[in-house]
C-alpha cells in the first residue's frame, strides 16, 4: 500500500467476544458482507466516522467462536482526522457491544499490524470438574477430569525454538512454510482455570487448538513426552489428536518493535 504524506497510521488494541462472529476476517461477495465478522464491523464503524471506506490490517485471523483480549489493528486516515486517543470513545459509541476498543495510538507509518508483529501470544482456558456455570460455557472448554499438569508441561516442553509444525496444521492451511519459532508453551492454574499459554512468531491455521487437543488426549491415555515428540516429528496431522473447541481460545497479546510504536514527531 502506498502511504501518502497526508495520512497517519493508527494502531488500535481491540477486545472482542467471538461467540457471534464468523471470525476476524471480513467475507464479502459482490461488495456485500456475507457473514458477520469483527473486521467487517470495525471497518463499518471507521467508515461511518470518516465518511469514506477505511481498510484495516489485523495482527491475526481468529476463527469463528475464538475471542481476543488484545487484537492489534492498524489503519490509515487523513492526518487532519481526530486525535488518536479520540478514536477510543468514538468507536466504542458506534461498535456493537461484543467489540471494544481498549487503546488507540498513532504509530510509525511503517507499522503493519500483521507483517511487523514480533510475536503473538494465545491463551486457552479449560475448566475441569463435573459441571460449570452456564455463563462460562462460551469462554472455556469444559472437561470432567483433572489432567496431570506436570505431565502436560513435560510434553509441552517439546514446543521450543524453530519447529516444523505441520502435525498441528489444519488441512486447509495455506502457509508456504510450516516452520514456526515458539518462545513459550506452558500450562498453569489461574482463578480455577487450567490455562495453556503459547507465544510464537506466528501460527498455522488451528495450530493452537490442535496442540491443546493433542496434549489433553495424550494425557488422558497416559502417553509420554516421547509420544508427543514423535507426533511433532512425524509432520502428519492424522498422527495428532482432536482439535480443541474454539470457545476456549483467546488471542492474548501482540508484540511489536518499539521504534515502530512511536509516532512521527511532526504530527500530533
From Swiss-Prot:
Substrate binds at residue 122. Transmembrane segments: none annotated. InterPro entries: PsdUridine_synth_cat_dom_sf (IPR020103), PsdUridine_synth_TruA (IPR001406), PsdUridine_synth_TruA_a/b_dom (IPR020097), PsdUridine_synth_TruA_C (IPR020095), TruA/RsuA/RluB/E/F_N (IPR020094). Pfam families: PseudoU_synth_1 (PF01416). GO terms for biological process: tRNA pseudouridine synthesis. CDD domains: PseudoU_synth_EcTruA. It is an enzyme of class 5 (isomerase). Keywords: Isomerase, tRNA processing. Homodimer. This is tRNA pseudouridine synthase A. It comes from Treponema denticola (strain ATCC 35405 / DSM 14222 / CIP 103919 / JCM 8153 / KCTC 15104). The gene is truA.
Amino acid at each position: 500500500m502506498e502511504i501518502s504524506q497526508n495520512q497517519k497510521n493508527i494502531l488500535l488494541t481491540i477486545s472482542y467476544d467471538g461467540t457471534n462472529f464468523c471470525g476476524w476476517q471480513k467475507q464479502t461477495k459482490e461488495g456485500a458482507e456475507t457473514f458477520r465478522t469483527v473486521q467487517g464491523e470495525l471497518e463499518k464503524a471507521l467508515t461511518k466516522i470518516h465518511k469514506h471506506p477505511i481498510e484495516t490490517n489485523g495482527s491475526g485471523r481468529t476463527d469463528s467462536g475464538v475471542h481476543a483480549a488484545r487484537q492489534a489493528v492498524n489503519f490509515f486516515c487523513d492526518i487532519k482526522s481526530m486525535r488518536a486517543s479520540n478514536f477510543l470513545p468514538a468507536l466504542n459509541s458506534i461498535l456493537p457491544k461484543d467489540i471494544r476498543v481498549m487503546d488507540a495510538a498513532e504509530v510509525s507509518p511503517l507499522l503493519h499490524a500483521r507483517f511487523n508483529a514480533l510475536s503473538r501470544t494465545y491463551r486457552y482456558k479449560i475448566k475441569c470438574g463435573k459441571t460449570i456455570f452456564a455463563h462460562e460455557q462460551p469462554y472455556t472448554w469444559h472437561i470432567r477430569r483433572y489432567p496431570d499438569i506436570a505431565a502436560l508441561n513435560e510434553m509441552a516442553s517439546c514446543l521450543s525454538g524453530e519447529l516444523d509444525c505441520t502435525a498441528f496444521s489444519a488441512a486447509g492451511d495455506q502457509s508456504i512454510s510450516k516452520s514456526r519459532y515458539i518462545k513459550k508453551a506452558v500450562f498453569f492454574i489461574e482463578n480455577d482455570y487450567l490455562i495453556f499459554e503459547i507465544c510464537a512468531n506466528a501460527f498455522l491455521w488451528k495450530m493452537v487448538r490442535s496442540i491443546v487437543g493433542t496434549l489433553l488426549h495424550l494425557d488422558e491415555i497416559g502417553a509420554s513426552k516421547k509420544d508427543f515428540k514423535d507426533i511433532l516429528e512425524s509432520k502428519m496431522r492424522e498422527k495428532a489428536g482432536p482439535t480443541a473447541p474454539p470457545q476456549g481460545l483467546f488471542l492474548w497479546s501482540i508484540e511489536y518493535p518499539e521504534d515502530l510504536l512511536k509516532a512521527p514527531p511532526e504530527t500530533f
